[in-house]
Amino acid sequence: MRPAIRIVPALLLVGVTAIWGWTFVVVKDAIASYPVVSFLGVRFVLAALVLWLIVLLLRQRGRVALAGLTIGVVLAFSYLSQTLGLKGTSVANTGLITGLFVVFTPIIDRLLWRVPSQRSTWLAAGFAFLGTALLTGGAPRGFHLGDLFVLLGSVGFALHITLLSRYAAAGPLLLAAWQMTAAGLLLTAGAVLTRSTVLPAPSSVLPALAITGILASAIAFWVQTYAQQRLPASRAALILTMEPAFTVFFAFLLAAERFRLLQAVGATLILLALFYSELRQRAAIGAAAPVLAPSTSEP
């Protein structure tokens, strides 16, 4: 794919990470008065309803139910594992371990689909993970049982990215709709089984549910699926590491939280990893392009 064409899905994915970073600030207050699993369940059910409405309006058809439901199960598992882990470990550990998805993605890509990993991919992933570590507070603060759940969630997020890149071409809208359906139903079932309050949600939480359900889930996952049909999984994972950078930025801008020097360095490392990856891919495309010898024949 030519660089000019590839930059559009990359920018769309950057936009998705910006939305997720912004909504993290919105969600923070909402889950203080509403169970996390219930919030996630209602959020994804709302997203599924919005996407199915769009599917009906656009009269979309396709045989992607199995792939979409499978990806949705992986997504629900990832969120549940991360949420369970967060209850048993620190926020810093959660952010740091979750950031390992950028390392796990090329590994899973190679194991499942035999996608070769270049040295530049690993170098960029290393820089991005180091940047994530600085953004989330540096070194882990001791080992907790919750860390294992967060680690499983990180593997799940990496698998989610690789599956999207593999099956997104089958139909981004339908795939996103089935994905939200599976995730919403499973997370809602999880909330019911844990006897968490699902409905009615507190009125103070409704704006956050609407924002995250429609914008950060229905639209964002649709756009992510569309973008990943044109991006390799390892490239998508690198771009998605920008989410904590946007979270810190919007927390500083909207919630008056302090922006520390280490966080600025971390955000810079993530950006450098993205630029390095882009330059290496452009160089690889240029080297692979055929060289046409000038014609010596007269017209």
Segments (PLM) and residue ranges:
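Juxtamembrane helix-entry segments on the extracytoplasmic side of multipass membrane proteins
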Residues: 4-10, 33-37, 41, 60-66, ...
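Hydrophobic transmembrane alpha-helices of multi-pass small-molecule transport proteins
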Residues: 51, 73-75, 117-137, 153-157, ...
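C-terminal-most transmembrane helix of multi-pass membrane proteins
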Residues: 2-3, 44, 137, 205-207, ...
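Specific transmembrane alpha-helical segments of multi-pass solute transporters/efflux pumps
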Residues: 19, 23-24, 52-98, 106, ...
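Transmembrane alpha-helices of multi-pass small-molecule transport proteins
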Residues: 8, 32-77, 104-108, 156-160, ...
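C-terminal transmembrane-helix exit sites in multi-pass transporters
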Residues: 50-59, 82, 101-123, 245-265
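Transmembrane alpha-helical segments that form core, pore/gating elements
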Residues: 25, 47-51, 105-107, 111, ...
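Helix-helix packing/entry segments at the starts of transmembrane helices
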Residues: 41-42, 80, 94-100, 163-185, ...
